[in-house]
Amino acid sequence: MVMGGLLAGGGYVGACLFVAVHPTTVNVGHRPIQPVPFSHKIHAGQLKLDCRYCHNTVDRAAHAAIPPTATCGNCHGGNLVTEDKRALSNIHIASKKLEPVRSSLETDESIDWIRVHDLPDFVYFNHSAHVTRGVSCVHCHGRVDQMEVVSQVHTLSMKF
């Protein structure tokens, strides 16, 4: 019985160490090239858009949603019209950088964004549990509102 407890305890410690050194947990500086160059510095910084405008599930779901292209279309949709006949805004509609957004809006195919802050599949983390208790986005993600290109600035190890 004691031996079983030692083995289980050792397995738990091993799993914790594995998570603590897993590349996606400690990947400080991770800065993938996204399919659309998106400036959080402009959107969250200069324009003062709340994180939840795009990441709208962060306070009620386990995961902070990567926004659907329709969210981009609210401002960058151009001549497109929604199902309820609302015309979408036309901010920077001629920009070549937004071609994938326009294409996605027209075809209804998602943009393949690359997660910057990504935990291993075996780790359960609930964003809403932290956000609803007052943990700010900045605490884990850094000053994203000052980043032209988002990068991971802290380890995601929770420092146990």
List PLM regions with ranges:
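Short intrinsically disordered, low-complexity coil segments enriched in acidic
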Residues: M1-G4, A62, K97
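Sequence context surrounding c-type heme c attachment/ligation sites in exported
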Residues: H22, R31-T82, V123-F160
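Aromatic-capped interface at the extracytoplasmic side
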Residues: G14-P32
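Hydrophobic membrane-insertion alpha-helices, especially the h-region
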Residues: M1-L17
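Primarily the internal scaffold of c-type cytochrome electron-transfer domains
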Residues: A70, N79-V123
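A generic structural signal for short, solvent-exposed coil/turn residues
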Residues: V28-H30, H43, L105, H117
